[in-house]
């Protein structure tokens, strides 16, 4: 009995100690939460309803295969394009201290990119960057930076003038400072590439390899850019940089595979088809395919806009590194043989027109396989799996046997489709 009492006494002491420790932990956690809440309030950063809300493209005009048109009605040609599904348009707050808050994503941005810097300078500069009293800035991922792109811009590629008057960039200049490349400094007008922390994991040797996915807000594209000096060049390429802070969950998917061959992304609120179209088609056919599709009990499928489509890219996967498309393996991607004779994966259409100086003849796509170009006499992955470029909406791809543009981008026209719908 004495032993039992002694043990009971020990248990009581331990229990009291545990209660004190537990209470201290709870109080500490509450205090920590209060500090976090106080910090969030001080930062005035909104908490998004979904951690990875896709910001709209700001594409308000409709297009046919070549030009702007009046908005088509249900059942008419070219119905189903981006401008007819216009949601979550950008909303920013200028904090008047050199920072911009994105009210949709919960991210805070540097307003003015300042001078260009090398990639190493961009990476190393984040830890010492201090703006408006905040020191937790980071170099954005490609998905964070792409949240800023808008497709009310006009691609000036091929423009030979030096004046930027009348040109429209692919970023909201009501809030962000922006400048085109300066031809007087031996730069192209379109040399306005912005750096990210996202590197290409593929097998590209373009520019000596080691590509970084950057956003060009002058011409409205994602491409892989060499992080160091190009072969034969004394210096590496330089980039603009917009550091970011807040919402560290932005760009992280939460895929759930449903039992009906659909995939729900709980981070974005979008549902996708597990399988793609299985065959390529031109842009108008892609719109018709999406609008006419009834699948898994749903009839509200559509062609995704380019920012929705980019949201499901997995930049840690590629044909060269994982022997797969740049997408979570929960999805199925049709295998193709590319222009260079390699096993590869398709380009996928979006409903977003990529307007240029010749109006609306191109639409934006994402390359879930190698972003091929004909460069220095051979087909190679010039921009990396996950690049966003554009193709003519209609035509014969054989008219571009060596691609198009400075890096000879492969023109296919008959691209694949993956359908999307809103969960709610």
Put a short name on every predicted segment.
Residues 1-11:
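N-terminal secretory signal peptides that target proteins for export/translocation
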Residues 25-29:
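C-terminal motif of bacterial Sec signal peptides marking the signal peptidase cleavage site
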Residues 9-21:
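Sec-dependent N-terminal signal peptides
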Residues 30-138, 143-301, 307-424:
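Glycine-aromatic-enriched surface loops/turns that form tight recognition elements
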Residues 7, 19, 60-63:
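Compositionally biased, intrinsically disordered low-complexity regions
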């Amino acid at each position: 009995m004495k032993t039992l009492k002694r043990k009971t006494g020990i248990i009581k002491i331990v229990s009291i100690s545990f209660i004190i420790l537990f209470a201290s932990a709870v109080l500490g956690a509450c205090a920590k939460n209060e500090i976090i809440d106080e910090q969030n309030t001080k930062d005035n950063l909104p908490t998004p309803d979904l951690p990875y809300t896709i910001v709209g493209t700001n594409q308000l005009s409709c297009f046919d295969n070549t030009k702007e048109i009046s908005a088509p009605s249900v059942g008419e040609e070219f119905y189903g394009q981006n401008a007819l599904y216009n949601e979550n348009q950008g909303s920013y707050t200028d904090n008047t201290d050199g920072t911009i808050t994105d009210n949709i994503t919960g991210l805070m941005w540097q307003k003015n990119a300042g001078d260009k810097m090398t990639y190493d300078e961009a990476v190393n500069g984040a830890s010492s960057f201090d703006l408006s009293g905040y020191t937790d800035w980071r170099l954005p991922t490609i998905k964070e930076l792409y949240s800023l792109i808008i497709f009310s811009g006009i691609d000036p590629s091929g423009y030979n003038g030096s004046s930027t008057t009348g040109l429209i960039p692919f970023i909201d200049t009501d809030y962000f400072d922006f400048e085109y490349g300066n031809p007087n400094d031996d730069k192209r007008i379109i040399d306005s590439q912005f750096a990210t922390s996202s590197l290409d994991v593929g097998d590209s040797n373009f520019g000596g390899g080691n590509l970084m996915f950057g956003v060009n807000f002058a011409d409205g594209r994602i491409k892989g850019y060499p992080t160091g000096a190009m072969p034969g060049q004394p210096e590496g390429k330089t980039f603009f940089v917009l550091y970011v802070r807040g919402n560290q969950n932005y760009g992280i998917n939460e895929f759930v595979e449903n039992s009906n061959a659909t995939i729900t992304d709980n981070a974005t609120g979008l549902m996708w088809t597990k399988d793609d179209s299985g065959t390529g088609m031109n842009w108008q056919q892609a719109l018709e395919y999406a609008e006419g599709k009834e699948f898994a009990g749903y009839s509200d499928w559509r062609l995704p806009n380019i920012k929705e489509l980019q949201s499901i890219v997995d930049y840690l996967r590629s044909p060269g590194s994982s022997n797969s498309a740049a997408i979570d393996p929960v999805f199925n991607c049709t295998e193709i043989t590319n222009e260079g004779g390699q096993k590869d994966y398709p380009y996928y259409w979006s409903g977003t027109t990529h307007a240029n100086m010749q109006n609306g003849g191109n639409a934006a796509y994402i390359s879930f396989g190698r972003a091929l170009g004909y460069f220095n006499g051979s087909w190679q992955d010039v921009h990396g799996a996950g690049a966003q470029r554009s193709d003519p909406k209609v035509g014969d791809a054989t008219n571009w046997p060596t691609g198009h543009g400075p890096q000879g981008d492969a023109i296919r026209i008959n691209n694949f489709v993956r359908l999307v719908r809103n969960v709610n």
